[in-house]
């Protein structure tokens, strides 16, 4: 059997950036962890864990002075506030494209618009965009749901 590898394969630039940031942190040997899985890749998450950057599910699992890595999917503004209040160092690995969507959603909401986000409402990336856009943002998961807006 012949196996061909696509010319362009591997992580997208946002994920590559997040992964590189996490491995540099591992090399620095600082007390740290990611808040939730950095990316959707269990093997990489386990490798980071063995290198001293474990996946943690809550800010409650961090001690003051530790570094928290925000996942590539982003987090809401309340998480930034809670991390600052806990005196954590933030390493923001949010994908630049996600960060741009968060800012756009926030700007639209602040300008009085109703942000409509198309995606899976329970996906971490969509959740983070909704949190920046405010509680009145709408998520559409299926085309048939558009008529309900």
Briefly describe each language-model feature range:
Residues 1-149:
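The feature marks the mature, well-folded catalytic cores of soluble enzymes
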């Amino acid at each position: 059997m012949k196996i061909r590898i696509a010319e362009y394969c591997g992580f997208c630039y946002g994920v590559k950036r997040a992964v590189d940031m996490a491995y540099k942190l591992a090399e620095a040997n600082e007390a740290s962890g990611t808040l939730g899985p950095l990316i959707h890749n269990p093997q990489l998450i386990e490798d980071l864990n063995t290198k001293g950057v474990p996946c943690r599910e809550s800010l409650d699992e961090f001690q003051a002075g530790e570094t928290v890595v925000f996942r590539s999917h982003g987090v809401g503004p309340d998480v930034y506030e809670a991390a600052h209040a806990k005196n954590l160092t933030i390493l923001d690995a949010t994908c630049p494209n996600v960060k741009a969507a968060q800012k756009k959603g926030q700007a639209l909401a602040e300008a009085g618009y109703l942000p409509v986000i198309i995606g899976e409402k329970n996906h971490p990336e969509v959740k983070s965009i909704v949190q920046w856009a405010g509680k009145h943002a709408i998520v559409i998961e299926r085309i048939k749901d558009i008529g309900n807006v």
